[in-house]
Amino acid sequence: MTDSRKNKRPRKSILRPVTGPNALHLSDIFRNETTGGMLMLAATVAALLWANLGHHSYHFFRELALGPLTIEQWAADGLLTVFFFIAGLELKREFVEGSLSRPADALVPIVAAVCGMVFPAGIYTLFNVLASDGHPAGWAIPMATDIAFALAVLAIVGAGLPQAVRAFLLTLAIADDLGSIIVIAVFFSTGLDIWWLAGAIACIGLWGVMQHFHVDNGWWYVPIFIVGWWCMLRSGVHATIAGVAFGLLTRTEEDVLDDPVDRWQHKVEPWSAGVVVPFFALMSAGVHVSGKTFLALWTHPISLGIVCGLILGKVIGITLGSCLTARFTSAELGRGVVWRDIIAVAVLAGIGFTVSMLMTDLSFPKNHEFADEAKASVLMASFLAAILGGAMLHHRGKSHAMRQTKHSHEVPVAAGTCND
């Protein structure tokens, strides 16, 4: 959020007023990036323990029907829509007044994000096309970067780093989210029902019209969101697309302090970070680790493609994309950022997790063995990326802090060069 917003006039709130300056609510704790990452990690550990110590009870709970969907489906197709609604709000803000609103500033991380999706998908496909027992259907699994987890790690280890490093990672992850949303919409929509889709579009359009006419009572939007989500689910298009669409059509106003995007994010983000994502992790990350699964992590094309895609593909794609953009355009890295910072961020971007888990369920909907193997690979790659990327960024932060203390400067890379 830009500093200019501090002087903007207030507007009537959508739901309730934001937390006062001298008050700390539980919801404020859940808005903290570190808290969200730790809850996700705790839910992942709990899922692994439950799946391996109580394998039958874990799968019984996941497959328990609750109305029209199983609990696992409620997590992936229902609750995760809230997470994508937050992603849509983030995208809207960035498009209007953030890093994606200034093409010159956004070009490097956007190209880096695209290359950081193409290279992992290419590496996975290469492993699985060349192998006789390969399964190319999982090509989309290593494409995503988990924005919540990556920013949580950066918040823990990023002391001393230039603010532009966080801005680069944020823009990269948001562009990555947009790419993942497009992939889900284009490649994982099945059995399209035009009438249900028309109903979803009508709800999304109604949301946009109400936003245009400044309808600020948030409770009017709740049934529209639910009906639009249900129509999207029944249409054959993945239901999370509805969340993104609602977020993108939410109004944001540069001259208003408490605009609708801020209000919705302020109210919904604690539920997303504190309930939705941890519960999705609990329902998705429960991999039964047998000797066969462990062996497959090091030998099977699915596992090799995912791990190499997230660890190597992200680094190669993001670094190469950034380098070529800086070399052949007038775009530059942020103030104080050097290429070693970009490489460290590229390693951290190998944290796939939330969207990679969703891609796994979409890629192998009927083969639990392949899905478990893929999820175990995502977990291992994400863990390695978090450790390696965190260590590298911590080292970079110390280097920046030492240079600042000595009143010396590490010269940023100028546009058109990529040799630092």
Swiss-Prot record:
Pfam families: Na_H_antiport_1. It is found in: Cell membrane. Keywords: Antiport, Cell membrane, Ion transport, Membrane, Sodium, Sodium transport, Transmembrane, Transmembrane helix, Transport. It is a multi-pass membrane protein. The chain crosses the membrane at residues 34-54, 69-89, 107-127, 141-161, 168-190, 194-213, 271-291, 301-321, 342-362, 374-394. Na(+)/H(+) antiporter that extrudes sodium in exchange for external protons. This is Na(+)/H(+) antiporter NhaA. It comes from Cutibacterium acnes (strain DSM 16379 / KPA171202).
